[in-house]
Amino acid sequence: MPVASAPAVQISTATETEINEHAPTSLTVFRFADNPRILVLDFASLHEQGKMLNRVAAFVEKAGLPHDRVLTDGELDAAIRAQGDTVETFYLGHDYAAASLARFFALADSEQIMLDPAEQWLRALLQQEGWFASGVAAGLISLPAAGSDPRITASARAAILRHELSHGEFFSNPEYAEYVYKFWLTELTEDERGAVRDFLAKEGYDARVEELMFNEMQAYLMFTRDPTFFTPDMAAMTHERLATLQARFLAGMPAGWLRNVLASYQSAALAR
C-alpha cells in the first residue's frame, strides 16, 4: 500500500500591512505580495518560533557556535543557556536564505541529527516550495504575534517585520544583495564598518561572517526605525551621518518595493 504524502502547507499571499495586522492563533504561512520569493512564518508564540528555528539560527549566524555542523539537542540547549536566554528569547525574529536552509538540512541528515517535529515540518514546507534545488534565490523570515511576550508590542512587531522583510529581499534579489555589498565597501568608512561589526557582535551575530555583516547593516541602518532596536549611537554614528548614508543608499538603490519603503521614510522626514 502506498504511503500517503503529507498534506500541502497552505500559503496565503499578503501585503506587509496585512501580515502586520494579522493576529495568529497558530502558525500561519504567508507569501509576500510584493516579492513572492519571500515566505513569512507568523507564529502565535515565541516558544513555537524558537522550537522551529533556533537550531537554524545557531548554525547560520550565532557567534561562538559552529557553522560547519548542526548542534544536537543537548548542545543547542547548552548554547541557549550560556547566552542567558531561553527558547523564547534566543531570537525575536528570524531570516534565512534558501541556500542556508538547504545546507542545514543536508548536514543534519549526513550527521544523523534527530530534528524536532517542528523542524521536520519546516523541511516539508521547503521541499514543497522547491527550495532545495540548486541556485534558488529565496528568503524565509519569521515574526511572533503581538502580545506573545511583553516586548512584542504592536510597534515592535511592525519593526521586526520591516527589518526581516529587508533581509528577505536581500536573500531573494541578487541585484539588491550586490548593491548592498558595494555600498558597504564604498560608502561606509573602514571605521564605520568596524563600528557596525562591533554593534552586531554585541547583539550576538558572528562578526567573522562578512555577508552577515553587510546584510544586517542594510536592515538596521536603513530599515529599522524603532529606537527599541536601533539608534545610530549604537553603531557609534551621528544622526546626521546616518541620514546622509540613508540618502546615498536610496539614490542608487534598485527599483522595487523596498526602494519605495526607503523613499517613504525620506518623504516623511522632509514633510516634518
Where do the model's predicted regions map?
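Active-site scaffold of zinc-dependent metalloenzymes
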Residues: I80-R162
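Short, solvent-exposed segments of well-ordered alpha helices
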Residues: V9-S12, T17, E21, I152, ...
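Metalloprotease/metallohydrolase-associated module, dominated by Zn2+-dependent proteases
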Residues: P24, T28, A33-P36, L41, ...
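Active-site recognition of the HExxH zinc-binding catalytic motif
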Residues: A159-S172
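N-terminal low-structure segments adjacent to metalloprotease catalytic domains
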Residues: M1-A102, A255-R272
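Short, flexible loop/turn elements at secondary-structure junctions
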Residues: S45, P144-G147, S166, P174, ...
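Short acidic alpha-helical/loop segments enriched in Asp/Glu that coordinate divalent cations
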Residues: P174-E187
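Short catalytic/ligand-binding loop motif for oxyanion handling, primarily in non-cytosolic enzymes
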Residues: A23, L39, Q49, E169, ...
